[in-house]
Amino acid sequence: MRKLLFITLFITIVGGVQAQIIWDKPHLAEVKAHLHQPVYSMAYHHLIDEAEEALRQSPPTVMQKNKVAASGDKHDYLSLSRYFWPDPTKSDGLPYINRDGMSNPELERLDRNRLSEMTSAVSTLALAWYFTNEEKYASKAVEMIRTWFINKGTRMNPNMNYAQIVPGQNGDKGRCYGLIDSYAFVEMLDGVQLLASSKAFTSQDQKDLKTWFSRFLEWMLTSDQGREEARQLNNHATAYDVQVIAYAHFTGNRKVMDERLSQFYRKRMLTQIEADGRQPQELRRTLAFGYSQYNLSHIIDLFQIVRHSGCELEGMPLLQKAADFLARYIGKRVDEWPYQQINGWDEKQNALCQDLYRLYLLDNDRADYLRLAKKHVVRHWNDRFFLLYYVPDATDHAFAQAEVQLRYQLQQVDSLRKVQNDRCMMPRSVEKDGSLRMVGIGDWCSGFLSGELWMMYQFTHDPYWREQAVTNTWRLEDNKWNGSSHDLGFMMYDSFGVAYRLTGEQSYRDVVLQAARTLATRYDERVGCIRSWSWGTPDRWKYAVIIDNMMNLELLFEASRLTGDEHYRNIAISHANTTMKNHFRADGSCYHVVDYEPDDGSVIKRITHQGLFDESVWSRGQGWAIYGYTMCYRYTHDPAYLDQARKTVDFWFSQEQMPDDLIPYWDMRDPAIPSAPRDASAAAIIASALYELASYDEEKAELYRKYADKIAHNLESSYQPMPGTAQGFLLLHSTGNYPARDEIDVPINYADYYYLETLLRRAESVK
């Protein structure tokens, strides 16, 4: 009580709580200064699109409904109780009956939707004015405010006497529960506070609006409906208090504000939240999770209102208990929730994630809320939440940039598929003339786009990316029978394997296993390796094995993990051991190709196919080696694999001609350095491997993360194209096959794939 008294006195004495009610003005100022950053840019441009749409709308008004309240005054707000429907046993359907959790579409014909449209438009326009300083947005917002609240011919009477009526009951008068309809005014007033600095919103407008809300506040405090709502024991009472405090804040009624704040913990929180965090009144509903989150969100709103006072209300520990009770079900299926939730599970899960993020802003000691929110929140960057509350990190910005590019690329791909009449064509790189190079599903690069789309879904949780990933993944299914390719790991694990990891769906698992069976047919135990290319004359090579093939072993390791059949694992280990024995030089660098005598497995020669010369250091090949042996250690914990990965890393970063940004030249022995082409794909592969390697090597973890962080940062800052260019690829400056004069200094899809994987692993390493 002493702490509450202090808070009340503090608020009363200083009389200077900031003008904003829930929004944080310093945060908005920070956003305004960084609108060029990808996350904010996407949210901002969507906001402006909505504001432009609002400019074209006529101001909503209560006078537009085609039905009048029982009072006979069309200025009286009128809405239907959401869950009440006509009684099918009565000829006239009266009185309506309750179907809890089922919304009656009739409510759309009255004032509720118009109130929502108006408050949303005012908030949108106010934010658009704040971020752009363009008076047209403020003028439209003020027009809507005047129409709804001030102009005599169109204004709403300051009451909710006919809110949420139940036709056929109580003379069609409103119910106390109807006061929840006006909760939308709370956030709208944040927009109003922003408009106070505009030219359009005059001092008379401010005076008139405050007069309206003073009368509305008085009605809430003295009317039968208001008093009954105040006596409720669930989210309605919470929402009632938040509204009273917000309107008192706006109108300068300190007495009411202080009184309600001083009683809130005792009257609302202690009566609604059990010691273990359960909210019994909400848990009895058919939408128990949703209403529990709804009430929690209202309480957080109140804590944000008082945040600007520099104090905290006493109830934070109990509020956190309520959050903790719900948070344990984030990421789980609805059937794991022990109460009812007949619909809207995913939406309410996301709403809770946003609430947890706001709770973290109120108490930075609860970093677990931040981690949980960032792990599960749907990153639909157009969501206003990302403008009003979210503080994005570098990974958020990188994925937001990737979203812009990949949406653009999917448009380009779809157009070309129609032109070429082949729905299975996949994007690989950019041609010399700037056009998009498309390849068939048999190309070793065909699976990377699907993998990128799955990683976009993994990070954002946006269903759009899952839909795109599913569609593009199944186009590759026939590859599971493709015994002519050693690259089934690239083609099928980076698509179907990632899909199975993220979804657990049996259909993806089945394809992965068949692809592994097919890949295993390319293994010859006399050589101890999986054969790479099937093409090539005997004078060129008899049984070529390339370092790239290390990457395909993941498919085999996974097949054994999923089935318990050691056959695939044994092949992978044999291949890794033989490659480790024959592919590496004493300094830890690797050859590109080793040619074997197929009859006895003896080495015929060590050469290159994509490097500058046989003894050169082809950069992407070193990346395959580092990544491949790190991955092998993950599955086997064989220290020899860890040692090989370390040794190649040590060699790699000892290169005297390594650029300062750690994005290598395509071949580190090219005499044209520093004018030689770079290879961003090699950098992305190595960075991704380093994040994983750091988790296995405590001694060098800090060094490996330092290297990986630097590479990731430089790829983000200096190797990305302008949005809507480069055919939608994410990275510039990769090199495919320099000796063949093909794909030199261009965007390539595998660079993008390992770049996104790098970002995901970086985010995980921070946790």
What are the functions of these language-model segments?
Residues 1-20:
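Bacterial Sec-dependent N-terminal signal peptides
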Residues 156, 160-163, 175-290, 586-608, ...:
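Active-site cradle of extracellular carbohydrate-active enzymes
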Residues 80-83, 87-114, 171, 306, ...:
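Aromatic (Trp/Tyr) and acidic
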Residues 161-170, 280, 427-434, 473, ...:
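Short linear capping/connector segments at secondary-structure termini
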Residues 132, 152, 224, 268, ...:
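Alpha-helical junction/boundary sensor with strong preference for TPR arrays
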Residues 334-343, 719-738:
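A glycine-biased, small/acidic residue-tolerant capping/turn segment at secondary-structure junctions
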Residues 18-226, 262-265, 303, 307, ...:
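Extracellular glycan-targeting catalytic surfaces
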Residues 264-290, 297-325, 639-704:
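A beta-strand-loop signature enriched in Asp, Gly, Thr, and Trp
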